[in-house]
Amino acid sequence: MAERANLVFHNKEIDGTGMKRLISRLIDHFGMGYTSHILDQLKTLGFYQATTTSISLGIEDLLTIPSKGWLVQDAEQQSFLLEKHYYYGAVHAVEKLRQSVEIWYATSEYLKQEMNSNFRITDPSNPVYLMSFSGARGNASQVHQLVGMRGLMSDPQGQMIDLPIQSNLREGLSLTEYIISCYGARKGVVDTAVRTADAGYLTRRLVEVVQHIIVRRRDCGTIRGISVSPQNGMTEKLFVQTLIGRVLADDIYIGSRCIAARNQDIGIGLVNRFITAFRAQPFRAQPIYIRTPFTCRSTSWICQLCYGRSPTHSDLVELGEAVGIIAGQSIGEPGTQLTLRTFHTGGVFTGGTADLVRSPSNGKIQFNENLVHPTRTRHGQPAFLCYIDLHVTIQSQDILYSVNIPSKSLILVQNDQYVKSEQVIAEIRAGTSTLHFKERVQKHIYSESDGEMHWSTDVYHAPEYQYGNLRRLPKTSHLWILSVSMCRSSIASFSLHKDQDQMNTYGKKDREILDYSTSDRIMSNGHWNLIYPSIFQDNSDLLAKKRRNRFVIPLQYHQEQEKELISCFGISIEIPFMGVLRRNTIFAYFDDPRYRKDKKGSGIVKFRYRTLEEEYRTRAEDSEEEYETLEHEYRTREDEYETLEESKYGILEDEYEYETLENEYGSPENKYGNPENEYRTLEKDSEEEYGNPESKYRTQEDEYGTLEEDSEDEYGSPGESGEEKYGTLEEDSEEDSEDEYESPEEDSILKKEGLIEHRGTKEFSLKYQKEVDRFFFILQELHILPRSSSLKILDNSIIGVDTQLTKNTRSGLGGLVRVKRKKSHTELKIFSGDIHFPEEADKILGGCLIPPERQKKDSKESKKKKNWVYVQRKKILKSKEKYFVSVRPTVAYEMDEGRNLATLFPQDLLQEENNLQIRLVNFIYHENSKLTQRIYHTNSQFVRTCLVVNWEQEEKEKAGASLVEVRANDLIRDFLRIELVKSTISYTRKRYDRTSGGPTPHNRLDRANSNSFYSKAKIESLSQHQEAIGTLLNRNKEYQSLMILSASNCSRIGLFKNSKHPNAIKEWNPRIPILEIFGPLGAIVASISHFSSSYYLLTHNKILLKKYLFVDNLKQTFQVLQELKYSLIDENKRISNFDSNIMLDPFLLNCHFVHHDSWEETLAIIHLGQFICENVCLFKSHIKKSGQIFSVNMDSFVIRAAKPYLATTGATVNGHYGEILYKGDRLVTFIYEKSRSSDITQGLPKVEQIFEARSIDSLSPNLERRIEDWNERIPRILGVPWGFLIGAELTIAQSRISLVNKIQKVYRSQGVQIHNRHIEIIIRQVTSKVRVSEDGMSNVFSPGELIGLLRAERAGRALDESIYYRAILLGITRASLNTQSFISEASFQETARVLAKAALRGRIDWLKGLKENVVLGGIIPVGTGFQKFVHRSPQDKNLYFEIKKKNLFASEMRDFLFLHTELVSSDSDVTNNFYET
């Protein structure tokens, strides 16, 4: 007894690990037999103790924790607050998810802690408490689920379901909770069965790969090894684990003393000696080389020494042991366990790992604010991040506490703030532990309501890919979805409400006008054009919202020749979709109302080219002879033209039937105008017809240019050689285009006359540009009638106007009728004009035009003509001699050349000298002498004037102009943004004389020799300023505000930047030219009070502000202008009011201030277009809804409801600015990092992916690079045979080690210990194959064949020729199907295919593995059956020495190959270094 009393008595609980340690100590001390006896006694003791106390377990024993109710309530309150923050746009979706997970996780954890103390205090003998907390059965987490709350679940993908299960199993779950609980990954019903099957299948494949690996001999004689050294950042524990049970590949010396010999197995004693040696001399210690299954030289088995000790006892593994199957089972079995273990919440949060710093007492906190900078926490709350260790002092009443906060921590309080005791003041970032995988996850945010997307200026306007609609966010900003209620209507509906009226929900929204009744039409087909008919004057914003791809420049167009002022017409600017304008691109056009055909009907356009020589002549020299050029010239030209037309312009022959057109363009009226059943005559007094913008005829918007233009580009101008003046092609030319009309339907031909559709950007060459200075329109009618229709008139008869032609067709013109019958239809042409039968008809020139005031000698006419006439010679009924002449009235249109840009644009528009010019080009729409068909009684446009962007030829740099659309306050604004890439221009500054009307601000530049849009003289590259300048219009009738979005380093509004001294301004002459003050604004014309919308073309430097002036009398205008108030909003959102009226002289377009002081600055609380979040306290009452300020009045403002979404940097925005989105459309895609749980939801699939050699994440790129370098360098150094061998070996060695490490990482993170050598055996099989490459043809293997690396080496040595091959990584499935035994392959998968292939190849199975023998019923070659298979040959003993002799130069090579120790990436646990002969 005395002895026992002296023994140490351990009174503490013992758990599994303690038990393990105890047993291993016992084995070391007493050996196996005695230990088993001791353990038996322990078991008996345990049983005895367990049965003496009887434990029952009933449902009453599950006691719910009393504090659960208020804890859950508290968490719900926090979630509600979070939801509100999200709604206000204060946190974004990812932060919301993270925080909600953490709130519930914390609640759940707190409950778990409460549970323990609750049991201990209230019922210490509770059986549940006794069982679980003694560690006998169950664990705290399970009991927590029974009596606490189940908490958060992961879905099968390992993502969090952010709806927590609040009930526990004692209370029972609600239906939703039950489904989540099944779905969640904690022993989920859904998922366990599948996972178990997966784990089982993994085990089966692993065993299949390595079933034939048996320990067959003692030593394979290899002299390779893998180096292990604790210097490579290995923990001591890992180092010990790696070494114990291995065999040394080389002697180990400390100093000159050898402490361990080659082929000695390493026990715990030896390892301890290594460690002490390393500690004593950490730098001088050499790495230890050990043998592993990787280094074994045998092909299909393994030797004792390379395998090392058996896992079951501390001695070398026995011969005949089936180590392959043991390895497969050891790896697969934890997988099965892993699937079924409960694991925690899928690891979305890392909240558990962050340590909190709490305040030691109440007091005032102070720290150095220069050492921190503001940031957002993971939950979107403001915090400070400290770069370096920070000392924080807390001043309480009597004591000064100092708290040290480590670097990279977040400080959650402000400087000088009062903190309470135990308040969290900082959060320490947890050191990133290696066990946490980080993964990047995408999260999509979807719109919660219909609306219009709006983003701040922080979004790049150019999308990421040229034609995509994805944009990256450069910094954190809000996206707003402005609420929209859609009124879908094919045309602009006539609205009962004016702009900015408030509407009741059930108010009458708008009365739609039927499609065919109104004469105002919006052209559809992707471009909205703006037309201002009279009824829309007050609410033109209806139209404004619809314009998508085009904007209109209002032009002030005075035509002095005409008596009355033609009202302005808009230039339509084509905005290529996301496009950039290139040189010589048409970027705008307008249809001059003077060149418009009346509604009277179809006809022919005739014109001629002016050749270049003629341009130098004056018009006065045009003599009469030039009119009468010879007929054969026309003929040749016509032939040329016909061939041209037939061969090339097949497009023209498109038959457009009614239906196809409808499908393509909506309704045909939308494109061509609409039916109008009156004909207007063409008289001089119908000027208003031309000037009226409502009667526009547009052909399809995508077409640029005309046929003529194209033909000139591609084939040279057909009329290049001719000098002919007025005249046409040969007389019957319009009847030659026979088969253009195929449609049998009456009146439904919609033929695109003389237009080629050209979808791309039209560029034209300057080479062949000809000019036409006059063209003529000859009326002529064409009816295409179905074959069946009965005609009421005869061919060649003469009819009057409105004669009935068929049952329901009447003629629009009077004149000669020609009828042609075709296969499918009948063509009926009516030529207007008089018919004459002259005597000498053959002498008359066919098809010539006669100017007014002259008479044709051959014709009997002697009347004076007002207009030009067109004489055509026709044959009578095929007879050769008889001709008659038809004299047809024409309308002549002069092309006026004098009009250039100066009259169209104010001088300061688009004038960026030396860089950009805009040329004016007129296009004639119709082909010469082609019939223009009247379509649905519309008027057609003959000439379209195009503006062409043109850069100076000499400039080498590319310049690009693109159009940006920005929308604010419900107005679309498109800006022409001209980016001059890499053109650095220097600026000079010149002081002006003071005499020129007051002082000029300092920043005025000399416009003669520099570009005119910089406020400071400096050398600067223009490519920095790629921002648009815009205007923000207020539709309030009294004043409008202008907002300039300019690059911050570009010029702001002149004086904002330069005048830092307000006194300096007062000394100036009060008449300051407004042009200078406005800087980039340029001239301003104010909006007319009753007309509310205006459009501006804005360049990078100038803004043109012009209006449609619908006011006839200018006095009224003048009065209106005097009442205007102006205010400017600059980029910093300051509003500047000019406190004076501005006198505007609309003729001179220059503005002056008429007041003593230039401006006053008022800092407004709100401004137009500003976005306001809900509950912002601007006024006494809170704002009830988030939205955009829509209009500001004296005492109130209107908000358009909007919903903000916060988006972080790097998020991708889907959709375009101003796009209408519907509920559920994707708005933003976040990319965020979350720590990935390495548990089985992701762990097992990950292990499987590695074994199957599918890439899970890219290899460390430096590893790939190093291997490539090696593969390049080594052949150079060593010559080819060595090079390939070593290159392939290196690749294989590297990949093997990194694979082992990856697999170990997953298992260790789960707390599962698997010995490296099991994994090594499997990886060895997966990586031991090489593929023969085609470089060198060898006689042994065919290219592409998979062979073992060792076999390839041996074959190469035997044949003395180099075999070219590259290393390949097979998955376990493919490795199982690429073994030496076809029987084992066939019993695994694809039986028929494998057997058929084996039969064709005549494969032999040597029955070396276990499976083949099992299948065929033989004795398996392991254990006792092993002896029969192995006959020891006497040479085995001498093998080692022979190898020594062979490898004479091993030592020299070894030094050189030592270099690649560093080749292994630093994260690998084991580094390898092998050397080879």
From Swiss-Prot:
Query: Transport: present as a keyword of the record?
Result: no
What spans are recorded as compositionally biased (Basic and acidic residues)?
Answer: 629-638
- Region of interest: Disordered: 617-754
- What does this protein's record comment on cofactor binding? Binds 1 Zn(2+) ion per subunit.
Residues where Zn(2+) binds: C220, C296, C303, C306
Keywords associated with the record: Chloroplast, DNA-directed RNA polymerase, Metal-binding, Nucleotidyltransferase, Plastid, Transcription, Transferase, Zinc
Q: What is its main location?
A: plastid
Regions of biased composition (Acidic residues) lie at: 652-662, 702-715, 729-747
Alphabetized InterPro entries for the sequence: DNA-dir_RpoC2_beta_pp, RNA_pol_beta''_euk, RNA_pol_Rpb1_3_sf, RNA_pol_Rpb1_4, RNA_pol_Rpb1_5, Rpb1_funnel_sf
Pfam families, A to Z: RNA_pol_Rpb1_4, RNA_pol_Rpb1_5
Task: List the cysteine pairs that form cystine.
Answer: none
Leader sequence segment: none
Q: What is its EC number?
A: 2.7.7.6
Give the function comment from the record. DNA-dependent RNA polymerase catalyzes the transcription of DNA into RNA using the four ribonucleoside triphosphates as substrates.
The record's comment on protein family reads: Belongs to the RNA polymerase beta' chain family. RpoC2 subfamily.
The annotated subunit structure for this chain is: In plastids the minimal PEP RNA polymerase catalytic core is composed of four subunits: alpha, beta, beta', and beta''. When a (nuclear-encoded) sigma factor is associated with the core the holoenzyme is formed, which can initiate transcription.
Q: Known PANTHER family for this protein?
A: DNA-DIRECTED RNA POLYMERASE SUBUNIT BETA
Know the name of this protein?
Answer: DNA-directed RNA polymerase subunit beta''
Q: Which organism is it from?
A: Hordeum vulgare (Barley)
